[in-house]
Amino acid sequence: SKPAIIDEDGIDPSIFNDDDGRRYMLLNRGARIFELNEDATKQISKAELLFYGDNKRAPEGPHLLKKDGYYYLFEAEGGTGPGHRITVSRSRELKGIYEPCPYNPIMRQNNPDEIIQRCGHGKPVQTQNGDWYMVYLCGRKIGDGYSILGRETALDPISWTMDGWPIVNNLKGPSALQVKPDLPEMIWEDESDDDFNNSYLSNEWWFPRVPEMDGIKLKDSQVHIKGSKYDLDTMKAKNILLRRQKHFRFSAVCKLCMPELYPGQNCGMTCYYDENTYI
């Protein structure tokens, strides 16, 4: 479908469909909400603040779930660093007073030595078997504390307390090992190789910036990259073709056909994070 432009400032949008058929969008700076038209392509009300969060620090990524007469509001709080967490609040009315969960944060890494850190942006899902899980973002750190694989997706079980609150993994934080859900197996086929036989690049390839006109072309099962006068240490360097690093340990092989290089010119493979960090 064609994209629908919603002219509202904010990030982390999510859609909530209420029982009466009305549709809403939520955005950050706390949990702001506004109503959409029937096909969710137009904003038809002003944004209102539902709740600014329990932690009151950088609340974002709001999601709503309606269950057993309550509206449950999930938010990511604490910033995207080590203090990142998931909190939940609830109200009997969509735009009522939201009560913070007494068990907040319902997901947070409390051990700085564990590999999985920065847990947030959680969204609850229920399987066809009735089991509940929390899908959330996290970062796996290496020895110096950096998460070189970026933000990754994790899954942990949700249980519901006697007083009707959702808690994740029994409040033990993220699990490095978890029981496999009783669901049909879906195997993801990773596209690790590319012989450039198509007329387009696959979605595995990325550019840090929009390439120059004819800067990168596919021809005769080869990818042709036009040279640039700019080095990798500047944001003006545009003709850079990259693939995301998905594993801590990996091998990368490519066949390069290079023209004659003159003093000051470079051509080859790079391990690239940004214009300040590359090898």
List PLM regions with ranges:
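Carbohydrate-active catalytic/glycan-binding domains of CAZyme proteins
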Residues: 1-279
